[in-house]
Amino acid sequence: MAAAGSQQLQFAEGAAFPIFPAAHPGGQLLPAMRPASGLPAAPHDSRAPAATQCFPNRDSSPTAQTPAGLDPPGPSKGSAAPSAPQRRKRTSFSSEQLQLLELVFRQTMYPDIHLRERLAALTLLPESRIQVWFQNRRAKSRRQSGKSFQPLSSRRGVFLHCPAPGTEARCLKPQLPLEADVNHVPDPSMTGGGVCTSGSQSFETYSSLSEDIGSKLDSWEEHIFSALGNF
């Protein structure tokens, strides 16, 4: 039994890993062929690139082909990520600029492009910033009154002179004349020579509010030109 088991084991090993030595037709075994050290190496097969040229759309590298249904790989860590849209810097208005804008807003809440450009020249602010200020001011007025704010006068003929060339770059903050009257504009519903009290002070109303605004703008403009002449 032991001999039969060993024969079966040898037969199984021989069946699993058969060894067939190379033989000459005459029955003699030939030695293994080894390349001579003095002979040059076999040239590269030139037919290999031809097979690739037949299929130009195929790439030999396996990484170039992306499986269907998968997204392409994301950017590497070294590449900079797209920057988020930056928020516009908020413009700060001086007290003189706000007084002039409020003065014009009390006359007309929808200034045209020409009036906005002249305001920009006087306040040294961009015209786009002045337009945004009037939009925000109208929204604030609607929230306070609960209805659309009506302008006190339909007259838009406020004449604002543009400053001389080369003076726009100078940032001036002159004191607005008659600044007390700007914060206490008389009530348009009052007629005649009524008064508008605020605290312990009282101010006489003017016959025409639009003319008063125009005179204040002229005084403010003259004050700017006088300040420019001191330089």
From Swiss-Prot:
CDD domains linked: homeodomain (cd00086)
Tissues where this protein is expressed: Expressed in the primitive streak of the gastrulating embryo, and marks cells destined to form mesoderm and endoderm. Present in differentiating embryonic stem cells (at protein level).
Disruption phenotype: Mice display defects in mesendoderm morphogenesis and patterning during development. Embryos show a marked thickening of the primitive streak. By the early somite stage, embryonic development is arrested, with the formation of abnormal head folds, foreshortened body axis, absence of heart tube and gut, deficient paraxial mesoderm, and an enlarged midline tissue mass that replaces the notochord. Development of extra-embryonic structures is generally normal except that the allantois is often disproportionately large for the size of the mutant embryo.
SUPFAM superfamilies: Homeodomain-like
Biased composition (Low complexity): 76-85
Keywords: Developmental protein, Differentiation, DNA-binding, Homeobox, Nucleus, Transcription, Transcription regulation
DNA-binding region(s) from the entry: 86-145
Signal sequence segment: none
GO BP terms in the entry: cell migration involved in gastrulation; digestive tract development; endoderm development; endoderm formation; endodermal cell differentiation; gastrulation; heart development; hematopoietic progenitor cell differentiation
Record field: compositional bias (Polar residues): 54-66
Source organism, top-level taxon: Eukaryota
Residue span of region Disordered: 23-93
One term under GO cellular component: chromatin
Induction: By TGF-beta. Regulated by Nodal in mesendoderm morphogenesis. Regulated by FOXH1, which acts as a negative regulator by recruiting GSC to promoter during early development.
A Gene Ontology molecular function term of the record: RNA polymerase II cis-regulatory region sequence-specific DNA binding
Subcellular location field: Nucleus
Listed Gene3D superfamilies: Homeodomain-like
Family in the record: Belongs to the paired homeobox family.
Function: Transcription factor that play a central role in proper axial mesendoderm morphogenesis and endoderm formation. Required for efficient differentiation of cells from the primitive streak stage to blood, by acting early in the recruitment and/or expansion of mesodermal progenitors to the hemangioblastic and hematopoietic lineages. Also involved in the morphogenesis of the heart and the gut during embryogenesis. Acts as a negative regulator of brachyury expression.
The protein, known as: Homeobox protein MIXL1
Gene source species: Mus musculus (Mouse)
The gene coding this protein: Mixl1
